[in-house]
Amino acid sequence: MKLPIIFLTLLIFVSSCTSTLINGSSDEERTYSFSPTTSPFDPRSLNQELKIGRIGYCFDCARACMRRGKYIRTCSFERKLCRCSISDIK
């Protein structure tokens, strides 16, 4: 009778320790720290952020107008409106 009780007690103790260790290791993996020395400035990540916002949208609008040889006339990020001028670039 003593052997099953000791075995179950030991099993509960081991299972609680392993769950604690697993939770501790997964918390370490989820921790993110930003330090300029360990992760230097990346201009490509900044470029991705700008493409999402207003500056990026109007920049793409201006590039599209320049490819057509026109000036940018209107850029509205809220309405997603990009208009080029009628006259060509001289």
Curated annotation (Swiss-Prot):
Pollen tube attractants guiding pollen tubes to the ovular micropyle. Attracts specifically pollen tubes from A.thaliana, but not those from A.lyrata. Triggers endocytosis of MDIS1 in the pollen tube tip. Changing R83A: Compromised interaction with PRK6. Reduced pollen tube attraction. Transmembrane segments: none annotated. Belongs to the DEFL family. It is found in: Secreted. Residues 67-87 are annotated as: PRK6 binding. Expressed in the pistil. Detected exclusively in the synergid cells. Disulfide bonds join C58-C75, C61-C82, C65-C84. Interacts with MDIS1, MIK1, MIK2 and TDR/PXY, but not with MDIS2. Binds to PRK6 LRRs. Residues 1-19 form the signal peptide. InterPro entries: DEFL_AtLURE1-like (IPR047497). Glycans are attached at N23. This is Protein LURE 1.2. It comes from Arabidopsis thaliana. GO terms for cellular component: extracellular region. Changing R68A: Reduced interaction with PRK6. Normal pollen tube attraction. The lineage of its organism: Eukaryota, Viridiplantae, Streptophyta, Embryophyta, Tracheophyta. One of its GO terms (biological process) is pollen tube guidance.
